[in-house]
Amino acid sequence: MELLAGDPQPVEVPRDDGSTQRIYRCPTCQVALFSEYGRPEVRFVRGGTLDQPSVVEPDVHIFTRSRLRWVTLPDSVPAFEVYYDRKALWPAASLERLDAVLGPADSAA
C-alpha cells in the first residue's frame, strides 16, 4: 500500500481478545481508511476507500456476528462469526507473500 497524500490519524481501538487495533482515519471527515492489527507491516484497506471498489469482491466475510441483521451475505462466499483459519482459505501465493513480509512463524497465527 502506498499513501499518496494526507496524514491519516491513528485511533487505538480495543479488540475482543484484549489487544488493540489501530484504525487510520481521515483527519477531516474521520472515515476509516485502513487498519493495523498489531503489525504495521500488514495493513487492511477498507474497500469503500478504493477508487473502483466494485472491481474487488470479498473472498470471505468475517466477524459476521456483529453485522446488522438486515445485511444479507451471499451463500457463495464463506462467512465466519469471528476470524478464520487463513491457511485453509487463502491461495498459496497469498500465504507466500504474507510469509515474505512477516516470516513463516509470525504469519501462522
At which residue positions do the language-model features occur?
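A short Gly-Trp-Pro
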Residues: 1-109
